[in-house]
């Protein structure tokens, strides 16, 4: 059996009967091609392309960003096949920031001044996202941040030119706190990478859990450098604090090191863990049989979601790439869905008109209907919450539920306390 045939058989076996029936009923029609132009034969786009400058850490975070790129490329193909936007073809010019804010700023400058892009999009790391957001403010260029999760991006350091697609650290922490508060644990320890994302996540989780459970205390914090976690010494320090539960924010190679060492020491599953992002296939694919059981996580159970929006997306992605989507795929595709909806609503690519169009914009993503809040430019795209389990030699999420981001955002009054007034004009 060839590789592609074997993969198709594997994925088909994993999909439930209900899911396969839904896919068969919906067919393989592309999502954006249908929604962007409606019925009828599309007219080929012409004229000057609408140019999007996309900046991301492709060489640094390939497990997330290779699927991310595959998905936005698919979305662009569908848009152009359906007639483009405003009758014009869409073109994306991508640059690799290598995880460095300075490189991202250099690329942003070159994309706007030399490539004449109409807007900027992308970024993964929170410190890089903040740097590009500041550049967008200074140069008055629209920036749609697809992935960086720090709360500061839309609140303390938010600006009128920056919008964010993905659920923030506050939102995902709030999604987890409901389950965390049910644990009998009172003594908590945090483990997080020592940069903007980790710091933001720990701040949000601590505040939210203390509000839900005033009796808890955080007895220690571990701050390993990103991608440089020393698992043995980190866990030794954690155990010295005698925790009853752990809040983990590490991801990628750091997560793999932590899990391996924790399994060897018998820390997992003896000590309950609440963990951001650890249910995403980008990380479960690496952990494989080492996946720790019963962690409470946010993630993406791609083979368990039975909604029309996700089924169409899954079908189109698999048909194009002969691979299942990762969470990065959802983000990349959703980013282009948001951009397409904004340009269609604005009937223009002028920055000020796009800002007006994006505020309160309702659009579709593989996770379903989503909206950009006008007050803080944060989208309501949610995440899946569940527990980790090991099945057939691989990690997966169980007991899943979709947490709609709209239910995990602060009130307008709270936002006004944190977001600069000029950002809300």
Residue ranges of predicted features:
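Periplasmic-binding protein-like
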Residues: 111, 115-124, 144-146, 189-192, ...
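N-terminal secretory signal peptides
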Residues: 1-17, 24-31
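Beta-alpha junction/loop-to-helix N-cap segments that form part of ligand/metal-binding clefts
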Residues: 40-41, 64-70, 85-153, 165, ...
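Extracytoplasmic "Venus flytrap"
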Residues: 44-46, 51-73, 95-101, 124-125, ...
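Signal peptide-proximal N-terminal region
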Residues: 47, 70-92, 211-214
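Solvent-exposed, acidic/polar segments of extracytosolic/periplasmic ligand-binding ectodomains
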Residues: 362, 366-425
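Extracellular/periplasmic Venus flytrap/periplasmic-binding protein
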Residues: 106, 151-152, 159-265, 301-312
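Extracellular/periplasmic periplasmic-binding protein-like sensory domains
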Residues: 261-333, 344-349, 397-424
């Amino acid at each position: 059996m060839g590789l592609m045939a074997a993969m198709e058989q594997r994925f088909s076996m994993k999909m439930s009967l209900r899911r396969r029936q839904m896919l068969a009923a919906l067919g393989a029609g592309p999502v954006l091609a249908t929604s962007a132009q409606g019925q009828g034969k599309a007219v080929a786009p012409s004229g000057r392309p609408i140019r999007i400058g996309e900046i991301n850490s492709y060489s640094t975070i390939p497990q997330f960003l290779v699927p991310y790129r595959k998905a936005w490329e698919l979305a662009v193909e569908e848009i152009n096949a359906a007639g483009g936007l405003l009758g014009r073809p869409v073109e994306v010019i991508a640059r690799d920031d290598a995880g460095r804010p300075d490189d991202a700023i250099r690329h942003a400058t070159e994309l706007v001044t030399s490539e004449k892009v109409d807007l900027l999009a992308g970024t993964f790391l929170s410190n890089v996202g903040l740097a590009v957001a500041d550049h967008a403010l200074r140069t008055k260029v629209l920036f749609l941040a697809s992935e960086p999760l720090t709360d500061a991006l839309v609140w303390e350091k938010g600006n009128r030119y920056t919008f964010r697609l993905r659920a923030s650290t506050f939102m995902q922490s709030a999604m987890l706190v409901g389950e965390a508060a049910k644990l009998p644990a009172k003594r908590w320890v945090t483990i997080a990478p020592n940069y903007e994302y980790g710091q933001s996540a720990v701040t949000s989780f601590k505040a939210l859990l203390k509000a839900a459970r005033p009796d808890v205390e955080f007895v220690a914090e571990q701050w390993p450098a990103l991608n440089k976690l020393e698992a043995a010494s980190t866990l030794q320090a954690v155990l010295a604090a005698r925790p009853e539960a752990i809040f983990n924010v590490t991801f990628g190679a750091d997560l793999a090191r932590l899990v391996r060492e924790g399994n060897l020491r018998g820390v997992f599953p003896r000590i309950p863990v609440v963990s951001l992002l650890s249910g995403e296939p980008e990380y479960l694919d690496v952990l494989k049989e080492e996946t720790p059981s019963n962690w409470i996580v946010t993630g993406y159970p791609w083979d368990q979601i039975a909604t029309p929006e996700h089924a169409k997306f899954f079908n189109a992605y698999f048909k194009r790439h002969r691979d299942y989507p990762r969470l990065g795929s959802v983000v990349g595709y959703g980013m282009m869905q948001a951009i397409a909806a904004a340009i269609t609503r604005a009937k223009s690519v002028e920055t000020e008109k796009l800002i007006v169009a994006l505020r309160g914009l309702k659009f579709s993503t593989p996770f379903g209907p989503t909206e950009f809040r006008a007050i803080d430019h944060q989208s309501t795209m949610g995440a899946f919450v569940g527990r980790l389990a090991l099945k057939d030699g691989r990690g997966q999420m169980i007991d899943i539920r979709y947490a709609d981001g709209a239910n995990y955002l602060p009130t307008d009054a709270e936002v006004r306390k944190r977001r600069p007034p000029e950002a809300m004009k």
